[in-house]
Design a protein with these regions (language model features):
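Basic, Lys/Arg- and aromatic-enriched nucleic-acid-binding interface segment
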Residues: 164-166, 170-203, 304
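Active-site/catalytic core of tyrosine-dependent DNA strand-transfer enzymes
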Residues: 238-296, 383-386
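Short, basic (Lys/Arg/His-rich) helix/loop patches that form interaction surfaces
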Residues: 234, 284-324, 340
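C-terminal secondary-structure termini that scaffold catalytic or DNA-interacting sites
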Residues: 351-386
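Conserved tyrosine-mediated DNA breakage-rejoining catalytic core shared by Y-recombinases
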Residues: 199, 204, 208-242, 249
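Short, polar N-cap/turn motifs at the start of nucleic acid-interacting alpha helices
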Residues: 213-216, 279, 296-297, 316-337, ...
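N-terminal core-binding DNA-recognition domain of tyrosine recombinases/integrases
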Residues: 16-31, 40-150, 179
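Flexible interdomain linker/hinge and immediately adjacent N-terminus
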Residues: 127-179, 265-274
Length: 386
């Protein structure tokens, strides 16, 4: 087992171990890690309130949700420079910085993990009779009005799930993109950003590229999609391949099966002084240095949003094309996120409308025909036309 939850004596918690053993057979290691941490939080909560795991009720789940919404997340080290901006909006990007508390998505994920854990035990007949994470069905039978021509989807949301504020994806403006790209210190970092903003891949997918995954002739890169590990070739811009060529020339010979991205500095982790494959923490450090220099809070996912919004506004690309590049399973996901009216264009049109009203108000009233009183016409028609 790659991940286990241990009790205070150092032994594995048997109910969680059996669940994770079954869960790992059908999910990725990253999902196993995420669920293990979620169950660790739930187990600690049950110990704090003095309730056995198979005696838990919806009251314990409700109280945990209330506690998560009020508590602060534990940190390995205290905040330093980010303490003053935690939870506040950045004036340049207009994005909110992460706060010290648990976000609604974290609470929803916690509820999903606990519900899945009890569904496993109820299914094999060894757990409680009722799942302590109830669904809110609002008094109607699931799939009561299901269309037989459409696939079945899960009905009923978890009762204590908090609502997630819906926000539109933030695009990096062209002038800010130039500043961000100019803040990169190496050809490696420039190649990563240029590649990501042209092919709209996720950060983990970009970092997983190996030498054999680069098609120099057709200017394609092959990524392994998050969730199902499906391989997909994505087109990238000629500029990104220029920066990639410059970086690889500095790196030296690269085996086709080796990762493309390596650390710039050689470090000794017990096997000699050498370079190591670049991981997500190292990539975050690159953006953290650039954000500190520019006073921004951009992330790698902002580059994916920017590329997707650029594609969605291109009349030569269909929504199906954008869905394929982004790797979304459902076309509705792409449409809900990216098929939106440009906020800047809406603001511009409304500003023009307000300015036009001001101009009309300053224009003199048209002359009234001979034989009619202006006051009488105003009463009759509710004001003279402009």
């Amino acid at each position: 087992m790659p991940w286990l939850v241990l009790d205070p004596e150092g032994g594995p918690v048997e109910p969680i171990r059996r669940y994770l053993y079954d869960f790992s057979a059908r999910n990725r290691p990253g999902s196993v890690r995420s669920y293990a941490y979620g169950l660790l939080r739930w187990w600690r909560w049950l110990r704090a309130v003095g309730v056995q795991w198979d005696k838990a009720s919806p009251a314990e789940v409700r109280d945990l949700v209330l506690w998560l919404r009020a508590a602060e997340k534990p940190r390995n080290s205290p905040r330093r420079t980010s303490a003053a901006t935690a939870g506040k909006f950045n004036p340049i990007t207009r994005k909110r910085n992460l706060g010290d508390g648990y976000e609604p998505r974290t609470v929803r994920h916690s509820n999903s993990v606990v519900r899945s854990f009890y569904e496993f035990w109820i299914e094999i007949g060894e757990g409680p009779l009722l799942n302590p994470v109830p669904l809110d069905r609002r008094g109607r039978r699931p799939h009561a009005h299901h269309n037989p021509l459409e696939p079945f989807r899960a009905e009923g949301k978890i009762r204590y799930n908090p609502k997630v504020p819906r926000s539109r994806p933030r695009e990096i403006p062209d002038e800010h993109w130039k500043d961000l790209f100019g803040a990169m210190r190496s050809n490696r970092d420039r190649a990563i950003l240029a590649l990501d903003i042209s092919c709209a891949a996720r950060a983990s997918e970009i970092l997983g590229i190996c030498g054999v995954d680069v098609d120099w002739g057709d200017q394609l890169v092959r990524v392994r999609r998050k969730g199902n590990d499906a391989e997909q070739w994505l087109p990238a811009s000629p500029e990104s391949f220029v920066w990639l060529r410059l970086y690889l020339a500095e790196l030296g010979p690269l085996d086709l099966n080796d990762p493309v991205w390596w650390t710039l500095r050689r470090r000794d982790h017990g096997d000699g002084l050498r370079r190591h494959p670049m991981n997500y923490d190292a990539l975050r450090a690159v953006l953290r240095r650039a954000n500190k220099l520019l006073g921004t809070n951009y992330t790698m996912h902002d580059l994916r949003h920017t590329a997707a919004l650029r594609m969605s506004r291109d009349e030569s690309l269909s929504l199906r094309d954008v869905q394929t590049i982004l790797g979304h399973a459902h076309l509705s996901t792409t449409a809900d996120i990216y098929l939106i009216e440009d906020e800047a264009q809406v603001i511009r049109r409304v500003a023009e409308h307000l300015a036009e009203r001001e101009d009309r108000a300053r224009q003199p009233l048209p002359p009234v025909a001979v034989g009619y009183e202006a006051a009488d016409l105003a009463v009759l028609f509710g004001g003279l036309p402009r």
